[in-house]
Amino acid sequence: MSAQHLHSCKFYRLPLEIIPLICRFLSVQDIQSFIRVFPSFQTILDSSNDLFWKKKNYELRIRRNRLLRGSYAAGVSSSAMNGFVNGTQISSTPAEREYYSKSDEIKNICGLPPGPMKVEQIGHAIDHLVSETHTVDHLGSSIKASFFHIDDVPLEWISSICMQVQSFFSPAAREAISSLKSRTTTSNLLLSLFVGILFEDDLWYFFNTLYMLSSTSAIEFAYFLDSIFTVVRTDYEHYRDPLSQTLITSCTRIHNIVAVIESPYDEPNTKGLTSEQKMIVECQLNPGEVLKVKAFAGTGKTKALLEFAKSRPKDKILYVAFNKAAKEDAELRFPFNVKCSTMHGLAYGAILAQADLPQAKLERQLSNSTIASLLSLQVAFPKANRKNNPGTPSASLVASHIMFTLNRFMHSTDWQLGFRHISKRSLEVTKLSKEKLLAYTKKLWSLIVNFEYTHAPLIPDAYMKLLHLYEFPNIFSKYDYILFDEAQDFTPCMVDLIYRQKHARIVIVGDAHQCIYGFRGANACAFNENLYPSTKQLCLTKSFRFGNSVAKYANFLLSLKGENVKLKGVQNDHAYWSSASNPNNVSGAFRFFPHTIIFRTNKELILQSIRLSVSLPKEIPIAILGSMRKKAFQLLRSGSELAHGQRPSHPKLKDFSSWGEFEVHVKNSAEEDAELALVYDMADELFSESFLSRLDNCEKRLMDSKDDGDNGIILATAHQSKGLEWDNVQLGNDFRPKFDSVSFSRIGSSRYLQEEINILYVALTRAKKRLILNDTITKLYALECGLVRFAGGILTEDQLQPGKVALFVDWQIDKFSFFYETPAEGYNLLVEANEKSVWDIFFGVLSGAWQNYIANTSERLKRSMLFIENQLFAVHDQ
């Protein structure tokens, strides 16, 4: 081709940025030929910033090196001379010819013809290796095909597991498995696992499913997939077919499994363990015995459990996690003799093994409108009645109380639905007799557990309760140990189910002080020795997350609940009291980046995000943790529509015709709906004309924020932050515990007060290096340390000795930290107890100079708190 023809070629008229895009889909041989014909494009490719082209180029270089390192001795085998090798090799090196020789041998054994291999052919290879008794090697000799045998497992059990695996499939995976043919039950299972690995996210679930049936076959299957995926990927690279992200990801994940198999990861490593952790690892249990571990925040319970499992390689262990994220994280950490699952996952598998349920029956949610429809509540509670009698409840409101009653049963250890599951408030709101409300609830339960009735979904708590009520084979019986992590977050139903496994050695791990899911039925009953006694008890008190500054405030909170065990920190940290803890004070509050603010409520989180989006410089990124932002902003826009008399568009609000109807529903609902509660709490803002524009500006600011990981503000609620940690944490201003002498004396018996303390404890223990308290918590700490530790009690003679009665004037703040200092003679306030509590003494009538300070009964508390603020916190601003 002449130079004139070259320059008249259409390629030269293409935009330059298109050239790297074209090369992404060419083989190396084609690219080399392309550059030889158009040498000027070499410079364009070298200077390209196209990430896909760079990735392609890098992968090809890595592949070449891998082929060279993994090649056998130089030479050409007989099978390397077939047309496939000659037609696709990118060079004539002995290493590459040998590689293609070996790949042809693999294809021959798998019953595949020589030539470029596609991903879908792996399914044929699996079925061939499982179903054929004999196959043929590359020399034509008959060899035994004894791959992937699963011995001593009934075919019925394999079929049920296969059904369970396929129930998790996405539509794409279902279509893929339907296109593959299997001749045996084992082949069908392996093909299902293969499709799951290829299409679904939960890789370790599919691998562990096979591992629990046959560890040898699972390892053999992993090696096979690693080899066959390498062949497929190489064939794709040599042809014009682009590498899909699914294929690249699958290759990497399978290779990671093999790497874990080959690594000495399962060897126990007690080096670096604390003495408390070693006691857990070395604890010996007999069948039926229970070890309880009280693990405070950040004390390394996961590492202790990991080494516990590694030190028992011959035992079958079940690790029960609270949620899917924790389960998936555990699957990456624990050895292969550990089955990781959630309680709902175990129940789900058990139910599906017994019945082939349609997808409609397996929906995860049951809305109030669906319940009302199932029970025909619209007929019993029509809208017309509410117009004539405003006190008449709506069908949706009654449905919420029926579901609340059913939830109390499903979360309990009870065997039958009864009057004990009906709350007094439900009877008051619904205006139903307890017999009628119980009848509605029983009918709903019967519809849910009727496997043939698809209109009432079998929600997760329902199949969990079924597992509790009925014995299912082979769910727990095959395990020697059960590790029950985050036990404080499980419902009594789940805890009781674990404790009934008398054949196993049970390890209960958690922190009762982090029980903050009371609205889900959790009550930390696993740590109640009266209900569930243990054989042995151990503690983890040494926190690797923070130091003694944070630990001091954590211990203060726990002491309010009567906790005697002290938490100790090992890191360097600081706790600060900010005189201007308003997050809008950029210069004062945000001295450390990245910076996380934890709030008690969603309302305060949204309000602060709106304020910060205006007050913070645009260079400082702002982010709301999780999916809260999108949901909240959509709800609030729809809530604004409702507040201004318009028909709301959001599905959760569309059934309300007016704000008044919505308000009545929220106030009288059986359980708080966090999303509806947010709209209700934001009522003042929603009625404002300017709110929507401020909300839009905030959302735009959040979307425009690009956090580089080193400089930004993260906003979260305490519930969202559980299990996470950050260097710098600030408590939001909505943490405002309001205690008096009566409420302090009731902390031990009040579930509400205990959970409020738990939420605050969770929030402040997220800090690793710096914790910034708000004003209210700081004052509460001063109040407790100076006074309230004697609230409700009588001072003993020993406690009245000088230096032992720490009242407010004995406490100062130095560098934002509290310390006790015995004041100089003449300044220590000694009072005459006269068998009264210190609280009553301080806020009661005192003698001497204090008479001028205390004016009258109604002003005592107000003036006393003002005095505390002036005396204790004034030095901060000096």
Curated annotation (Swiss-Prot):
| Location(s) in or outside the cell | Cytoplasm; Nucleus
Top-level class of the enzyme under EC nomenclature? isomerase
**Record-level GO BP terms:** DNA recombination; double-strand break repair via homologous recombination; mitotic recombination-dependent replication fork processing; protein ubiquitination; regulation of DNA recombination; replication fork processing; resolution of meiotic recombination intermediates; SCF-dependent proteasomal ubiquitin-dependent protein catabolic process
The pathway noted for it is: Protein modification; protein ubiquitination
Record's keyword annotation contains DNA damage: yes
One Pfam family matching this protein: UvrD_C
Q: Which family does it belong to?
A: Belongs to the helicase family. UvrD subfamily.
Could you tell me what this protein is called?
Answer: F-box DNA helicase protein 1
From which source organism is this entry? Schizosaccharomyces pombe (strain 972 / ATCC 24843)
